[in-house]
């Protein structure tokens, strides 16, 4: 009798163990199978190749950095500037909210447009000009020499009063000359531009971006966007500053290239150049 009870107890305990542990084993195996299938499915979806559309041209308009502004200090103090010699920016849009409120508080906003120096609108159709817009017949062949001579001529001119066609051509001239500089010289070009215009370092990012994007501009898209989005005064200031700066800067940064080209320069040109680093100039009474 006792043996029969022990057998019954052991049989019942084994059955309880199987009932308690069985579902756990099955659950683990199910979850393991599920994770492996998920892993396989995720791998398979990541390996699926999505067809790529090539040669798709962007139709959106290019974003142009804001034009560098050097606001007139008289305007910032809340007074209208009536000086004919002030070459600072006089557009009210350049003022902060506080400065504009100060100007309104002084009741000076009722002045004429001439005192605010508001520039005339430009011809937006010239953003993408044709050869007919410039009306040139039998013009001379454009060479590097003629390009530099043209830049030297316009650097000494007042371009504030030129017509839209000439201003648009001057923007193209600037873009062409920017691309004659090596890419490593663009930061130096930017620094010289800031110094000439007395602009702060807060304007450096936008000025450098303009030079970089003009340098890599293909098809004149960025050049056209500048014409469309910048006002006439900003274009005039930028072009004028660039033409002065570009003719004074080295267009190459490689010392090997510079020294090699200096070797070929005519004597009259070499006499006016400072000695290259590492070179020594000897006078008649110098001794070794």
Swiss-Prot record:
Task: Give the boundaries of each C3H1-type zinc finger.
Answer: 72-90
GO molecular function (one): RNA binding
**Which Gene Ontology terms describe the biological processes this protein takes part in?**
symbiont-mediated suppression of host innate immune response
Give the region (RNA-binding) as residue ranges. Answer: 26-40
Where does this protein reside within or beyond the cell? Virion; Host cytoplasm
Tell me the segments the record calls region Oligomerization.
94-112
Write out the ranges of the annotated region (Disordered): 1-49
Q: How is it modified after translation?
A: Phosphorylated by host. Phosphorylation negatively regulates the transcription activation. Phosphorylation and dephosphorylation take place in viral inclusion bodies and are largely influenced by the presence of NP. Dephosphorylated by host PPP2R5C; this dephosphorylation enhances viral transcription and is mediated by NP.
Which key words are in the record?
A: Activator, Host cytoplasm, Host-virus interaction, Inhibition of host innate immune response by virus, Metal-binding, Phosphoprotein, RNA-binding, Suppressor of RNA silencing, Transcription, Viral immunoevasion, Viral nucleoprotein, Virion, Zinc, Zinc-finger
Basic and acidic residues bias: where?
Answer: 30-41
Protein task = Multifunctional protein that acts as a viral transcriptional activator. Promotes read-through of an RNA hairpin in the NP open reading frame to enhance viral transcription. Mechanistically, nonphosphorylated VP30 hexamers form a ternary complex with the viral leader RNA. Clamps the RNA template and the complex VP35-polymerase L together, thereby increasing the polymerase affinity for the RNA template to increase transcription initiation despite the presence of RNA secondary structures. Also assists stop-start transcription at gene junctions to promote transcription of downstream genes.
Could you tell me what this protein is called?
Transcriptional activator VP30
Q: Which gene encodes it?
A: VP30
């Amino acid at each position: 009798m006792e043996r029969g009870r022990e057998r019954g107890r052991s049989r019942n305990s084994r059955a309880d163990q199987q009932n308690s542990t069985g579902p756990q084993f099955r659950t683990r195996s199910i979850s393991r199978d599920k994770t492996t299938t998920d892993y396989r499915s995720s791998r398979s979806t990541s390996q699926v190749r999505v067809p790529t559309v090539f040669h798709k041209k962007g139709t959106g308009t290019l974003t142009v950095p804001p034009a560098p502004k050097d606001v007139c200090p008289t305007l910032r103090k809340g007074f209208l500037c009536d000086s004919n010699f002030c070459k600072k920016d006089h557009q009210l849009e350049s003022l902060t909210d506080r400065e504009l409120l100060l100007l309104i508080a002084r009741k000076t906003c009722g002045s004429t447009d001439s005192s605010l120096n508001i520039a005339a609108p430009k011809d937006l159709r010239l953003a993408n000009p044709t050869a007919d817009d410039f009306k040139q017949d039998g013009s001379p062949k454009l060479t590097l020499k003629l390009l530099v001579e043209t830049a030297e001529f316009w650097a000494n001119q007042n371009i504030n009063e030129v017509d839209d066609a000439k201003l648009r051509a001057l923007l193209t001239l600037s873009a062409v000359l920017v691309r004659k500089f090596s890419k490593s010289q663009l930061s130096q070009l930017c620094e010289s531009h800031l110094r000439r215009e007395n602009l702060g370092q807060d304007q450096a990012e936008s000025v450098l971006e303009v030079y970089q994007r003009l340098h890599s501009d293909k098809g004149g898209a960025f050049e056209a966007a500048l014409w469309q989005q910048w006002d006439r005064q900003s274009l005039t200031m930028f072009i004028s500053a660039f033409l002065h700066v570009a003719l004074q800067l080295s267009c190459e940064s490689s010392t090997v290239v510079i020294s090699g080209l200096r070797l070929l320069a005519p004597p009259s040109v070499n006499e006016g150049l400072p000695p290259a680093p590492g070179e020594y100039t000897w006078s008649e009474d110098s001794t070794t």
